[in-house]
Amino acid sequence: MSNELLASYDTFPYQSHPFRQSHPDRLATIGHLFGMTPPSVETARVLEIGCAAGGNLLPMAESLPNAEFVGVDLSPRQVEEGRDDVRKLGLANVRLVAMDITDFPADLGAFDYIVAHGVYSWV
């Protein structure tokens, strides 16, 4: 990816807000409606691709303290803003990573729920 394109993510930040339709409670309910047996929301591992500053992910982490949340975003600026909020809120169950999703490392592990709302909204 070009440096110019990378810089644009910091120049024009995505407005990061909660999107309740992506909460694991909602996703699990939809899974039940389709005959699935979704993983427990209370202890789930949740990944948000394109998390920006964590505006969607942090409220989830606050409401589900025994779950684990990982957010990835291309913008180091937004990820750092989100990390500041994580520290201010004292959330121990959130990890925000600045990275290109095409370079997603296997060591981040498997996830029970994956959200990519911001990616589709921004594109």
Model-derived regions: residue spans:
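Conserved SAM/SAH-binding beta-strand->alpha-helix loop
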Residues: 75-76
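N-terminal, positively charged/glycine-rich alpha-helical extensions of SAM-dependent methyltransferases
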Residues: 1-24
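A short acidic, Gly/Pro-enriched loop at the edge of an enzyme's catalytic core
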Residues: 105-114
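Conserved SAM-binding loop
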Residues: 82
